[in-house]
Structure formats: C-alpha cells, structure tokens
Amino acid sequence: MGKPVDDLLNSLMNLLDSETPSGGGCHLCDGLLSRELGKMLRKALSELEGVELSSVKSGVSLPAILIEREDRIRANHNPPKMRSLKVTLTRLLDVAISSLTGLKVSQEPDAILIFDFERGDVKLELAPVFIFGRYRKLQRGISQSRRKCPECGGRGCEACGWKGKIPQGSVEGIVGEVMREFFSAEDYVLHGAGREDVDARMLGEGRPFVMELLSPKRRSADLREVESEINRRAAGLIEVKNLEFSRREKIRILKERSPNVKKLYRALVEVEGGVEEGELELLKGLEGAVIRQRTPKRVLWRRADITRLKRVYEVNFRRIDDKKFELFVLCDGGLYVKELISGDDGRTSPSVTEILGKKSFCSELDVLEVMVE
C-alpha cells in the first residue's frame, strides 16, 4: 500500500495547495496536514486490516487552535467561498479511504474512522451487528441477562475478562458467547421482549429478542450454522430459532410492544387446606377482570412502587390432587402471575387467594407463549 498511499497523498496535498493563496503554504494549519496526513492514512489502513466491511465514513477532530484560527479568518475577512476545514478534510478523507480500499462511503456505515489531528491518531469505531430471533428456556434457574461478576462486583477483572459480567447461567451469555465468536465481536447485549423470572421456563415458540454485537470484526455469517452451534452447546438448557439479521430499530419496536402483548402462562398452584373441583370453578370469575396490582414486594428493590392495571382474558385449570392444580392464564404482558395467585398480602386484587379464601402460592411457572404481533 506504500506507493498508492504516497500517490494519493500527493494528489490530496496538491488539491489542498490549489486552494491556498500563493506564497508560503497554508496559513490556517501551519503545515499540520502535510506533516500528519500520510502517517494517519497509513494508520487508518492498518486499523482496517482483518476487518470485514462494505462501507465506511470518516470523522475529523482538529486542534482547538485551528478552529479558533478559522473562526478569526471568517470574522475578519468573511471570504464568500470559504469552506470549513473540517468538512473539506472529511470529504477528502472519505474519497481517499474509498479509493485505497474499495469501500463505499455511507451515512450509515459499517465503520467510522476518526482522524484525531491533535493527537496524530486514528480510531476505528465499528457499528454493531443486530440479530433477531426467539429463544426457549428449557430449564429453571437460568437468568435472561448476565449477572455481575462475583469477584469484582461488576467493575471488571481478569476472572470475567474485564467485562464485569459472567456469561454462565444466562440466556444472554450462552447465546452471546457463540455469536461473539462467529462475528469476532468485543461484547454483546441481549434485548428481549420482556423477561421471565429466573425460576420460570420459557416454552412454546419462544421469546423474541435482538442480540446486539458490539465492535464486530466480521459482519456476515451463516445464521443457520450459528443457530445450530448455539443449540448444540446449550442442549437441554436453551434453544434459539429463526435467527435473522436485523437493525437497531427492531429493539425499539420490541420494547414499545412488550407491555402490550398478551402472554399465556402455566402455573402449578398449591393451596393451604386443599381445594375441591367445585371451588376451582370460582376462578372463572377472573376472566375479563382488570387486576389492580401494586408493584410486588419481591421486586420493589428494582421497580417503582406504583399500581398497574392489567387484564386477564382467559383462565383454565386442571386439578392434580387435593392440594395442587395447574392454572392456565392468558393475560396482559407485565402482569406478575405469581402475585396474581398469592395476592401478595393484598397488593394484587383480585387474586386466587382472595377468590378461594385460602392461601395459595405458585410453586412452578412456565411462559407458554409470548404473543407479539
């Protein structure tokens, strides 16, 4: 790349010189560009080595003194056709990088090259890759998000690879680690359409999610192969399906729709003092009911203490023995079903406990369907 860079550099400098008044070079930058531009172009090409891209954009950071000098020239002389040095330089660098690499210039690029002329450095910022899909959680005890590293409390240490989080035991970590390898990404973030409790399974067609892969050096992969590898490594724990490339906009759509989706739950309910088949028929009174639910005590540490109104659409049940029955509930997303059963000491009403007149609690919970349009 030595000679192509030199040839292009000469062309760029000639172009800049052609816009400089004759007799002594550039009074604006004092020769900064001629001294630094070649070195920084080579650094940019070095940053791009081994990175899979189809588009790029340049960004420029100039020393404050150059900006001040440019402002004084404008104020004192008001040149009619004077273009901003930053804008001009950005356009020239876009052309240069595109010519040297064959990458197209885009306003929504795969990467941005930041040319810092104050420090004489170039930084490559890689746009995330977004992958949409659904996950099924087949075992209890798996969280959706990674947990803080117990060694450092989230600050980052050698034990957690300086991430502050541990991948083991979470959907985000199990799925994200495989995707990170395929895309040579630095890190990842899972964005889900809501979340289930750690001790709940996510069954049926699965929960929609978007995985955001940060600073990926690869941008393409066979997603069927990615899917297969995730399911192989996580056999019996989780499954993913229907993986497809997506965009950041999908995250916003998931988050906006999540509180409004309907969800179907299966709960194993235990009743103090036992329950008869006829008593269970009373639970049909929940169908169509609007539930007044104050934030459950168990999540007050992370949720505002407010009252939410959620609707139950359908209720079915199956008696197992004198003290247990299965409860199937179709309801609004965001309804805490464990508290719909227990009543949470009156914070949720009506509840199974209230209707039966007997203390009831949920010993198992499964999400059977997340009905996202």
UniProtKB/Swiss-Prot annotation:
List of catalytic residues: 197
GO molecular function terms noted in the UniProt entry: pseudouridine synthase activity; tRNA binding; tRNA pseudouridine(55) synthase activity
InterPro entries for the chain: PsdUridine_synth_cat_dom_sf, Pus10, Pus10-like, Pus10-like_C
Example GO BP: tRNA pseudouridine synthesis
EC number(s) given by UniProt: 5.4.99.25
Keywords attached to this entry: Isomerase, RNA-binding, tRNA processing
Annotated binding of substrate, by residue: 265, 336
Keyword Endoplasmic reticulum set for record: no
Pfam families: Pus10_C
Catalytic activity: uridine(54) in tRNA = pseudouridine(54) in tRNA; uridine(55) in tRNA = pseudouridine(55) in tRNA
Superkingdom per UniProt: Archaea
UniProt similarity note: Belongs to the pseudouridine synthase Pus10 family.
NCBIfam families: pseudo_Pus10arc (TIGR01213)
Role, per record: Responsible for synthesis of pseudouridine from uracil-54 and uracil-55 in the psi GC loop of transfer RNAs.
Protein name according to UniProt: tRNA pseudouridine synthase Pus10
Organism: Korarchaeum cryptofilum (strain OPF8)
